[in-house]
Amino acid sequence: MKALKKVSNILCVLGLCTLMGGTSYAWDGKKDGTGTHSLIAEHGLSMLNNDLSGNESQQVKDNIKILNEYLGDLKLGSTYPDYDPNAYDLYQDHFYDPDTGNNFTIDNSWYASYPIYDTSRNSVRKFATLAKNEWEKGNFKEATFLLGQGLHYLGDLNTPYHASNVTAVDSPGHVKYETFVEERKDNYALNTSGNDTTSGVYKEAMENPSFNKWMTQNSIKYAKIAKDLYYSHSTMSHSWDDWDYSGREAIKNSQVCTAGFLYRFMNEVSNGNTGDNDSLTNEFNIVLKTADNKYAGTDDNVYFGFETNEGKKFEWKLDNAGNDFERNQVDNYILKTKDGEEVDINNISNYWIRKERLTSISDDWELSNFKLIANGKVIQQQDVNKVFTGNETYYINK
């Protein structure tokens, strides 16, 4: 029952929030777009500006100019995930161990609530893909805000404690270390990577023709560096000098990683990069927004599915820990095919969203819009603006 699930989850969250202090304590970020996350985003862009080769295409230069004009939105986006009212209560998706591929809800034995499969690695890809989609429509302000959110999770990947799945429950060092770094962040700020955009991190950012695969590869690379830094210089048994070295390296890596990421993103939106030609996938990511009306939310079950040209059907129940489909809420779901079966996204004939009545009394649901992501691209999107009543299926033809 959803009600039982919610009660169990609330009890677990209340207990864990007491232990964790009610926050994830990653790199610090303030709601007004200041703090460590903001510094990383701003200096990552500053690096790109200063390192930009004169041989870059005019399209890249023009788009970087636009990005600079929306720096404030980039900084606001870079701190927003810590204040998002729709966020997981324990910020579970801000963690990612590159060796297990999981966040702490799966890896840490003390976590007794429902597992969360979102990680900072997945979140980087999701927000960058959504940002690219909006940028290509000319919605630069919204795109930059979404890109900033992606950079937030990229920063989390570079945080030693987050890349090791060591929470404030596991060690008091989590809060102490990140507070230590926050107090010294300005000492760690950089304005160049040491290379221009023809070499170094920028050259590496362009080596994989697939944006989606590169994002995954890049996240794993930097998370491994951060995890190694945790065990070598960042635990409670290490000295203040060790922590200073760790903080300096971690913030440097965050800024350099951000500069490379922004460079790749600018090339993607400038050159119409079509490197992601792989149409096979076993994983989808759907993002749905419930309307901002008084009775728009629902406790009924919601499903998403599609059918291939051969008539094979796939369907998933959309059910995260906590409350799904609340008024004005954006919900995100990672959908994996059974046994890792690969689906050709070019071979999908139609999609559907289905509401199933949970009790004898229907709990209507008003869906505003949705976006479906696969292989680093938004492959389906629609402003639905529809009220679902009773047991109802809404078909979306490709």
Curated annotation (Swiss-Prot):
Keyword Iron recorded: no
Residues involved in Zn(2+) 1 binding: 27, 37, 156
Region (Linker) residue spans: 273-281
One Gene Ontology CC term in the entry: extracellular region
Domain named Zn-dependent PLC: residues: 27-276
Binding residue positions for Ca(2+) 3: 298-299, 323-324
EC annotation from Swiss-Prot or TrEMBL: 3.1.4.3
Subcellular location(s) of the protein: Secreted
Details of cofactor binding: Binds 3 Ca(2+) ions per subunit.
Keywords: Calcium, Cytolysis, Hemolysis, Hydrolase, Metal-binding, Secreted, Signal, Toxin, Virulence, Zinc
Domain remarks in the Swiss-Prot or TrEMBL record: The protein is composed of 2 domains; the N-terminal domain contains the phospholipase C active site (PLC), in a cleft which is also occupied by the 3 zinc ions. The C-terminal domain is a putative phospholipid-recognition domain, which shows structural homology with phospholipid-binding C2-like domains from a range of eukaryotic proteins. The ability to bind membrane phospholipids in a Ca(2+) dependent manner is conferred by this C-terminal domain.
Protein name (record): Phospholipase C
Organism: Paraclostridium bifermentans
